[in-house]
Amino acid sequence: MEAEMLYSALALTFAIFMVYRILSNSQDKRSLTKLPPSPPGWLPVIGHAHLMKNLLHRTLYDFSQKLGPIFSIRFGSRLVVVVSSSSLVEECFTKYDIVLANRPQASVDRRSLGFSTTSVIGAPYGDHWRNLRKLCDLEVFAPTRLASFLSIRLDERDRMISALYKISSAGFAKVNLEAKIVELTFNNIMRMVAAKRYYGEEAEDDEEAKRFRDLTKEALELTSASNPGEIFPILRWLGCNGLEKKLAVHSRKTDEFMQGLLDEHRRGERQNTMVDHLLSLQESQPEYYTDEIITGLIVALIIAGTDASVVTTEWAMSLLLNHPKVLEKARKELDTLVGHERMVDEHDLPKLRYLHCIVLETLRLFPSVPTLVPHEPSEDCKIGGYNVPKGTMVLVNAWAIHRDPKVWDDPLSFKPDRFEIMEVETHKLLPFGMGRRACPGAGLAQKFVGLALGSLIQCFDWERTSPEKIDLNEGSGITLPKAKTLEAMCKPRHVMEKVLRQVSNV
């Protein structure tokens, strides 16, 4: 019965579509001829959706090699324009920065994933978004605010280093680096947000921590899931909306969890947390700083701020394990500028130029969000001489731009040294986006990654678990995780033994 209904609905949709095509006026047809080129294989109703493979950024890269630096595809009836060159990105976010400052509005509830009209990531461009961005810049990511959380970042770093030392104090031991980096990053964020630690041995059996870990795991799974109902709305009419139901349930559970956090902080003594600070702002401006606004900000920070830092640190360590000479050069820089009597600190990071080059090269090869967050023009515009109508989804394939041989010498190779002699231009290296919708948390993410990476290099010797190189295959998702969990062999460096014993209280 369901199959018959689906067939009838698709047949009806096809018929309506063909009538629309026949009745389209000539001006519309002339406008369509000025769109960026499209790949062959378009089909009625589904467009080019059947051509999309698991790793979207690679599929789009393949299209760009045949069609050029700007092309168009159809996800169902939705027009999507893909930009894959640094010069066109510069045009987009200088000439058309305001026009492209909008976000496509999802037809399903994604607020528990950080993409909603109440979050700085997903809000449409306008006064509301400007207020959210100002709030992020002045209250959440302000240098003084981040400096007030420095002790948390150092303490979580010390906990990770101590755990690794206890595992490997007798000699080389295999460690699950991904798990350690996840624990470091999520505990960092949640202590800043609400003075909570939800990962680690002491939180293993805590019910609240379990709820948070389950919600986070579900969120990361849902971000990588596709929703056919957004491409083919008719499927919703037929009840084929399993993902939408999962998102609705996840949003409800996330709202309940976050409301519990807010209520707990209202009842308790004021602390140096982001939740407490936002609640204090709510007292003076309750009409704006609603619980919904605060929840949207916090959820976006948790989802966007953690996963990107985790995958970047994991990719960096994977690349270093495959390039021991680069690892040794970074270690020598740390030994020279920091020494062996203390651990690297955040105030050292500006001096550690080669370490910064490693982070930049990692972000070049494996940008945490390879196609960035989509944009949507608020009016018709032209990009690269082609028409881009209002309401089009515009994707920037940062992954492709970062591997463009016209921009980068030997683009597929891991060469941090390239950044020692070249100036970074934002339209060529854009892991955090560009223009007014660029990621507001880029500075915090780089602090996380730089401190974690520097500490791992300074304190331990690292080797691969086998002679084979680390697998650099990419996993699926909105972010760019490794396909395989990173495991490595580590042992304490002899010259850091004294410091490691102090950190580990042994």
From Swiss-Prot:
One Gene Ontology cellular component annotation held by this UniProt entry = endoplasmic reticulum membrane
Q: Which cofactor does it need?
A: heme
Q: What is the membrane topology noted in the UniProt record heading this document?
A: Single-pass membrane protein
**Keywords assigned:** Endoplasmic reticulum, Heme, Iron, Membrane, Metal-binding, Monooxygenase, Oxidoreductase, Transmembrane, Transmembrane helix
Gene3D superfamilies in the record, alphabetically? Cytochrome P450
Membrane-spanning residues: 3-23
Q: In which tissues is it expressed?
A: Expressed in seeds and leaves.
Record's SUPFAM superfamilies?
A: Cytochrome P450
Q: Entry's InterPro entries?
A: Cyt_P450 (IPR001128), Cyt_P450_CS (IPR017972), Cyt_P450_E_grp-I (IPR002401), Cyt_P450_sf (IPR036396), Plant_Cytochrome_P450_Monoox (IPR050651)
Q: Does the keyword Transmembrane helix apply?
A: yes
Pfam families per UniProt: p450
Q: Where in the cell is it found?
A: Endoplasmic reticulum membrane
Q: What is its main location?
A: endoplasmic reticulum
State which Enzyme Commission number(s) the record gives.
Answer: 1.14.19.74
Give the reactions, separated by semicolons, that this protein catalyses: (+)-piperitol + reduced [NADPH--hemoprotein reductase] + O2 = (+)-sesamin + oxidized [NADPH--hemoprotein reductase] + 2 H2O + H(+); (+)-pinoresinol + reduced [NADPH--hemoprotein reductase] + O2 = (+)-piperitol + oxidized [NADPH--hemoprotein reductase] + 2 H2O + H(+)
Which EC class does it fall in? oxidoreductase
* Residues that bind heme: 439
Q: Which GO terms describe its molecular function?
A: heme binding; iron ion binding; monooxygenase activity; oxidoreductase activity, acting on paired donors, with incorporation or reduction of molecular oxygen
Primary role = Involved in the biosynthesis of (+)-sesamin, a furofuran class lignan. Functions in a dual catalytic mode. Catalyzes the synthesis of (+)-sesamin from (+)- pinoresinol by formation of two successive methylenedioxy bridges on (+)-pinoresinol and (+)-piperitol, respectively.
What is stated as this protein's family in its record? Belongs to the cytochrome P450 family.
Kindly provide the name given to this protein in its UniProt entry: (+)-piperitol/(+)-sesamin synthase CYP81Q1
Which lineage? Eukaryota, Viridiplantae, Streptophyta, Embryophyta, Tracheophyta
- Gene encoding the protein: CYP81Q1
